[in-house]
């Protein structure tokens, strides 16, 4: 069997299926109140910290009170990470953006 390029369509599909499998596993873990142990198992402390930072980035971008450069200084995140978050938020479905605003900005 020939080795697949890491950028092949077949490999991309396999990675997508693996991601969906993880999402299903996480959903099941939530239903069984095992989500925190699962996430602690699957993510390193650095990865968990990075996810928390990304939530803060999205929250602050939705709030719209700081520039990307100010966010970089406030959160200690790279400008590329903040720009990716901004671009992803712009491309997000309207329903997701509205839900995020409700959930993340509810105390404002």
Swiss-Prot record:
Domain of life, per lineage: Bacteria
Places the protein is found: Cytoplasm
DNA-binding region residue numbers: 68-91
Keyword tags: Cytoplasm, DNA-binding, Repressor, Transcription, Transcription regulation
Principal subcellular localization: cytoplasm
A GO MF label: sequence-specific DNA binding
GO cellular component terms attached to this protein's record: cytoplasm
GO biological process, alphabetically ordered: negative regulation of DNA-templated transcription; regulation of DNA-templated transcription
Family classification: Belongs to the TrpR family.
Subunit organization: Homodimer.
Free-text function comment from the UniProt entry: This protein is an aporepressor. When complexed with L-tryptophan it binds the operator region of the trp operon (5'-ACTAGT-'3') and prevents the initiation of transcription. The complex also regulates trp repressor biosynthesis by binding to its regulatory region.
NCBIfam families (alphabetical): TrpR (TIGR01321)
Name this polypeptide is given: Trp operon repressor
Underlying gene: trpR
């Amino acid at each position: 069997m020939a080795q697949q390029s890491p950028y092949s369509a077949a490999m991309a599909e396999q990675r997508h299926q693996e991601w969906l499998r993880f999402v299903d596993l996480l959903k099941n873990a939530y239903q069984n109140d095992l989500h925190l142990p699962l996430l602690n198992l699957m993510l390193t402390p650095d990865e968990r910290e990075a996810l928390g930072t990304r939530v803060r980035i999205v929250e602050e971008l939705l709030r719209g009170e700081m520039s990307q450069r100010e966010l970089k200084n406030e959160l200690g995140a790279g400008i590329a990470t903040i720009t990716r978050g901004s671009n992803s938020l712009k491309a997000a479905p309207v329903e997701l953006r509205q839900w995020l605003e409700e959930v993340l900005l509810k105390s404002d």
